[in-house]
């Protein structure tokens, strides 16, 4: 039996003298890092890696990420084949020094009734674009009336970086940039956002469009158990005809499994070190420790860990036979992080435009 863990955010994006995991008890993770075979690949967008895992060839072209993410939304019906979609996620724009930056909203910050009012206003004002809808307070969609002839950057690429470097590109770039400006005016003046600002809360004063593409059939993946909470990964799995359930280590140990653990992704993107440390300590207890024990007992034949991040992707492979190689010493995560080059913040580095 083999398990493949995908853990975006495990590689802390910033380089610092004091390691981000300093003081954490990560005995099992250090054992896995020391016992296994490690390699490090250059940066590749997370969505491209997920697509390849689900059977999409490298030359599959622009993937319909919005349609796939929407397919993975438990609260919404599957999008019809041939429909065009964009993710239209609410964000907050603010100035930091001379740059306009954006930040996203956690799932519990925007109230459902406020979201409903904002969505209704957008549909009243921008009906020519298509139809807006919200799956959750922080995940919105636009079903396009006509295809978008532009390239968009995923939201996670733009978080915390100058917005001007991640604006739409391509044939209709100016149209979409103008549309975003018009949306910002409507959202800024909306009573919901006026009330939020008056109360000292962040306004949802813009939308971030990404994931353009037509909903279409996907390649069939090799049958295996897939565990994921992330709606994009759920969409990839469902499109490939796979069953997908929430991550659970005990169930993963019952059969060959592909597991996406995105607990560390948002804290790493936002450089939220406290949340990252708390969640990493939990992963040590709920995943790394039981998987290390399963390797030692030979209940698990092999474990692969892929950790995509801005600094590249760590690939780790540990076999049950490696457990008895006593000369291999544990490798603390902070020691590994110090050996990895800093991330390149340029938009060219984030070449997975969608």
Regions found by a protein language model. Name each.
Residues 22-25, 112-120, 179, 183-186, ...:
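Well-ordered, non-membrane alpha-helical segments in soluble/globular domains
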Residues 130, 136-152, 187:
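Glycine-rich, mobile lid/loop segments that gate access to catalytic sites or pores
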């Amino acid at each position: 039996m083999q398990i493949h863990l995908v853990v975006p955010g495990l590689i802390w994006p910033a380089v610092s003298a004091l390691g981000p995991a300093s003081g954490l008890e990560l005995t099992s993770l250090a054992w896995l890092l020391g016992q296994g075979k490690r390699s490090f690949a250059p940066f590749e967008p997370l969505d491209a890696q997920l697509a390849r895992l689900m059977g999409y060839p490298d030359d599959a072209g622009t993937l319909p990420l919005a349609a796939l993410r929407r397919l993975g939304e438990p609260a919404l019906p599957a999008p019809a084949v041939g429909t065009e979609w964009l993710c239209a996620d609410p964000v907050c724009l603010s100035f930091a020094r001379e740059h306009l930056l954006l930040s996203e909203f956690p799932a519990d910050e925007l109230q459902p009734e406020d979201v409903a009012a904002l969505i209704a206003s957008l549909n009243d004002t921008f009906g020519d674009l298509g139809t807006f809808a919200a799956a959750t307070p922080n995940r919105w969609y636009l079903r396009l009336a006509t295809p978008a002839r532009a390239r968009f950057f995923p939201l996670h690429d733009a978080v915390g970086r100058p917005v001007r470097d991640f604006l739409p590109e391509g044939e209709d770039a100016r149209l979409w940039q103008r549309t975003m400006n018009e949306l910002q005016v409507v959202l800024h003046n909306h009573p919901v956002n006026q009330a939020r600002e008056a109360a000292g809360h962040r306004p949802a004063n813009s939308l971030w469009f990404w994931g353009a593409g037509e909903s279409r059939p996907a390649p069939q993946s090799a049958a295996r158990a897939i565990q994921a909470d992330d709606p994009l990964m759920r969409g990839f799995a469902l499109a490939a005809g796979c069953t997908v359930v929430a991550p659970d280590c005990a169930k993963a140990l019952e059969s060959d499994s592909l597991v996406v653990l995105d607990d560390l992704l948002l804290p790493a993107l936002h450089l939220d070190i406290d949340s990252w440390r708390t969640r990493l300590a939990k992963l040590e207890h709920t995943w790394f420790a039981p998987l290390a024990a399963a390797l030692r007992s030979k209940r698990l034949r092999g474990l692969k860990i892929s950790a995509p991040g801005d600094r590249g992707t760590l690939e780790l492979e540990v076999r049950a036979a490696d457990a008895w190689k006593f000369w291999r010493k544990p490798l603390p995560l902070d020691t590994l992080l110090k050996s990895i080059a800093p991330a390149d913040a340029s938009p060219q580095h984030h070449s997975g435009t969608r």
